[in-house]
Amino acid sequence: MVILDPTLDERTVAPSLETFLNVIRKDGGTVDKVDIWGRRRLAYEIAKHAEGIYAVIDVKAEPATVSELDRQLNLNESVLRTKVLRTDKH
């Protein structure tokens, strides 16, 4: 899950996320789904913002690749928060 700066235009969110998702594809992983929830109210302010643009991304990749994606997202100033969760294997 990624929470982006609410001042971004919502139409530019998906193309800007694609640049980060290329890290997954380049290392042999797959991007299963990108679900942009849109602008939502935050439970508490983050960097003086009361809202954020939420995006949920489902990927299959090696742990090192996911760590690199998380690192690059955290370096971007338009990303307020990231949360990486591993799903259970079925």
Curated annotation (Swiss-Prot):
Organism of derivation: Mycolicibacterium smegmatis (strain ATCC 700084 / mc(2)155) (Mycobacterium smegmatis)
Organism taxonomic ancestry: Bacteria, Bacillati, Actinomycetota, Actinomycetes, Mycobacteriales
GO CC, one annotated term: cytoplasm
Keywords assigned by UniProt, alphabetized: Isopeptide bond, Ribonucleoprotein, Ribosomal protein, RNA-binding, rRNA-binding, Ubl conjugation
PANTHER family: MITOCHONDRIAL 28S RIBOSOMAL PROTEIN S6, SMALL RIBOSOMAL SUBUNIT PROTEIN BS6M
Pfam family, one: Ribosomal_S6
Cross-link (Isoglutamyl lysine isopeptide (Lys-Gln) (interchain with Q-Cter in protein Pup)): 33
Swiss-Prot/TrEMBL GO biological process terms: translation
Function: Binds together with bS18 to 16S ribosomal RNA.
A GO molecular-function descriptor: small ribosomal subunit rRNA binding
Family membership: Belongs to the bacterial ribosomal protein bS6 family.
InterPro entries on file: Ribosomal_bS6, Ribosomal_bS6_CS, Ribosomal_bS6_sf, Ribosomal_S6_plastid/chlpt, Transl_elong_EF1B/ribsomal_bS6
NCBIfam families named in the record: S6
Domain of life: Bacteria
Protein name, as recorded: Small ribosomal subunit protein bS6
